[in-house]
Amino acid sequence: MIRLTAVLFQATRRWWYEWTAVLPLALVWFVCQLLVLPGPPATAVLYALMRQSSDNQWWNGRDAWQAAKTLFWPAWKWALVNGLVVGLVVFNLLAYWDVPGAVWTLLRVVWLLVLTIWLGLNLVYWPFWLAQTDKSLRNTYANCGRFLLLNPLSGLGVTAVSALVLFVSIFTILPFVLGSMAWVALVGVTAVQHSLLTRDT
């Protein structure tokens, strides 16, 4: 099992060390989300470059562009699945949020749990996709699921902390808002690396 504190400490240390490089990258990522079409590929590229940073490998704009071309269609496949699942869960939560009754309360709890697990899977989706040979959606999500099964508390802990950081960053200064997504990517990358090292030892 991975150690939550070790993952967060290592990711935060790397994020701080790479701050000057991360900020322009995060700004480009933010703009891409506003433009929609390049949004999912930009997220995949962010993970890919943070993986290189975690491995002490330098990267530049050419690396980012090459990654964007490689990851464009895989990223959109991932985004479409995400949109379907998250849309379904959010619709059910909003549509039945005020419906009274114990059964409906239980269903809302189930939907919230499903959403949390799904976010946990996607936190580590790209680190697994980048690390494995079989890059299909099915195989990647299977590996993400195994990760959460093998590290249930740490996995949910990493997910909760990442979600909290993103939420808090929305109400803080712009540089932290931009840099927080890079930090989340580093957390996902670091968690997967720790998991793979634990498996191999």
Question: How would you describe each model-predicted region?
Answer:
Residues 1-201:
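Hydrophobic alpha-helical membrane segments
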